């Protein structure tokens, strides 16, 4: 391996004690021949004496940079990290938060991993990130005598303690730590411990500084790394420990995260960013895998598409109409619609090319940017019956907001074919588990499905026409018109 320089960028704000411990562990790195490191600390206006602590470390590192920036209304993690990026001179950039500890071989492992594959981005396994010492049991960490040489072993033990492990652990194991197998590897990005090749960082650009407060800036950064063809890897050997500290301003952080999630969707306006607004948790990939594989026209056959097309004649009147859930250009053309939402990328490409006079967007329809009452009619097909009921509710509510009338066009005479459950060879016994409900009661079921890179996927729901119509009657002030496969020309409220 040729010489490699690894730059650590550490943003900090009033965490002098945590920063000191983190720098102590970095100072204990045992560097192999040809590996060098620099440490860049960016102080975002601390008032707790951080500068005095940092001055003590200038002589402990061969390359050390400390920059202080006065706090103002635009202070944020993104701006602080971007300032660090401009100061860094390494071939590899490692982003660490204050109080994140790494073992003595961390730098060597990072250098070796990225030498193997220059486009690789490392998501470092991290323990303790969600632990709050004011609420959680700290005895698992208190029992440990933590040192730079035993940190990986400590992380391994702590990861076995409920609440202490990395929440990405399950999806990483399911994909043999190759997160590029996922539909949305960027959704798991956390810059509290992430390594990026400097050249790839330059291609992707720095952090989006419109993300003020807390949340989403690292996910958006990882999204652009994904667009720059990064290969994402969950790194276990070069692991990290987040020293637990009190979670301050919880409500403020929650509001900030919600605002930043909305900004993320405004910036991209695609199905994944839309799902982040509608579904809390790290299971976006399970839902996206289903949406990417879904082709209602193929599943239900030619007769289904004919029934849909016959229903289109009722709205081909030139009025502003939005279609949701039609993935065939020929079928969609029968509606004369002005707008159409495509729920997966493959359909989006076909529909956009096949309908040049129609405005096609890559969206589910649960969180759109249309004004209230923008459409004369929104037509929703059997597609809504395949979604989890919580997402179906979101689609109906949004349709009621943006349209003067909503039509449920149900042309499927039977339920769709279920994917055959074929567990991987290593699985001797198939057990279906349902994770604990999220805060809003949303829960997901998973099943093993065949595929080279696919381990889990949200199952296919099939709500009856009556169930969806009942939801519409409850959620929409004027109800919805429903057309069924058995009686496709008779409309009923």
Predicted regions and their residues:
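A recurrent flexible, glycine/aromatic-enriched loop bordering the glycosyltransferase active site
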Residues: 157-170, 176-195
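Short, well-formed alpha-helical segments that are part of the catalytic scaffolds
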Residues: 15-30
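Acidic donor-binding/catalytic loop of UDP-sugar-dependent glycosyltransferases
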Residues: 49, 98-113, 389-393
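Conserved donor NDP-sugar-binding/catalytic core segment of glycosyltransferases
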Residues: 105-163
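Short aromatic/hydrophobic "clamp" motif used to bind/position activated sugar donors
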Residues: 93
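Catalytic core of nucleotide-sugar-dependent glycosyltransferases
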Residues: 250-276
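Acidic donor-binding segment of Leloir-type glycosyltransferases
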Residues: 26-71
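Glycine-rich, basic loop-to-helix element that forms the pyrophosphate-binding segment
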Residues: 71-88
């Amino acid at each position: 391996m040729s010489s490699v320089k690894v730059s650590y960028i550490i943003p900090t704000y009033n965490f002098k004690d945590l920063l000191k411990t983190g720098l102590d562990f970095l100072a204990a790195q045992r560097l192999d021949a040809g590996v060098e490191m620099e440490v860049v600390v960016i102080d975002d206006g601390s008032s707790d004496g951080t500068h005095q602590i940092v001055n003590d470390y200038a002589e402990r590192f061969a390359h050390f940079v400390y920059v202080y920036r006065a706090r103002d209304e635009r202070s944020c993690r993104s701006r602080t990290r971007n300032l660090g990026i401009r100061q860094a001179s390494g071939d590899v950039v490692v982003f660490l938060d204050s109080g994140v500890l790494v073992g003595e071989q961390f730098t060597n492992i990072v250098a070796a991993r990225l030498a193997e594959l220059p486009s690789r981005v490392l998501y470092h396994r991290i323990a303790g990130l969600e632990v709050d010492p004011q609420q959680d049991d700290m005895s698992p960490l208190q029992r440990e005598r933590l040192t730079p040489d035993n940190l990986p072993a400590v992380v391994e033990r702590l990861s076995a303690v409920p609440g202490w492990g990395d929440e990405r652990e399950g999806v990483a194991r399911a994909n043999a730590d190759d997160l590029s197998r996922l539909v949305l590897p960027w959704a798991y990005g956390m810059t509290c411990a992430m390594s990026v090749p400097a050249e790839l960082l330059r291609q992707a650009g720095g952090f989006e500084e419109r993300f003020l407060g807390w949340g989403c800036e690292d996910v958006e950064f990882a999204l652009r790394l994904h667009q720059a063809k990064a290969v994402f890897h969950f790194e276990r050997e070069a692991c990290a420990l987040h020293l637990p500290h009190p979670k301050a301003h919880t409500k403020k952080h929650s509001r900030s995260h919600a605002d930043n999630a909305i900004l993320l969707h405004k910036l991209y306006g695609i199905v994944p960013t839309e799902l982040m607004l509608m579904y809390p948790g790290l299971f976006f990939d399970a839902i996206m895998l289903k949406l990417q594989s879904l082709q209602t026209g193929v599943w239900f056959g030619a007769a289904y598409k004919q029934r849909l097309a016959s229903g289109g004649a009722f709205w081909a009147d030139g009025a502003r109409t939005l279609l949701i859930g039609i993935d065939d250009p020929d079928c969609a053309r029968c509606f004369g619609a002005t707008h159409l939402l495509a729920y997966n990328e493959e359909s989006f490409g076909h529909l956009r090319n096949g309908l040049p006079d129609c405005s096609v967007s890559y969206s589910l329809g649960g969180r759109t940017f249309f004004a209230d009452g923008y459409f004369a009619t929104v037509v929703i097909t059997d597609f809504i019956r395949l979604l989890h009921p919580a997402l179906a509710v979101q689609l109906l509510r949004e349709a009621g907001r943006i349209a003067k009338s909503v039509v449920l066009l149900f042309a499927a005479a039977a339920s769709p074919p279920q994917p055959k459950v074929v567990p991987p060879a290593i699985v001797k016994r198939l057990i279906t588990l349902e994770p604990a409900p999220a805060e809003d009661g949303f829960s997901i079921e998973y099943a093993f499905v065949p595929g080279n890179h696919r381990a889990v996927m949200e199952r296919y729901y099939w709500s009856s026409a009556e169930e969806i119509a009942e939801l519409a009657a409850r959620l929409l002030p004027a109800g919805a018109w429903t057309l069924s496969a058995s009686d496709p020309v008779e409309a009923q409220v």
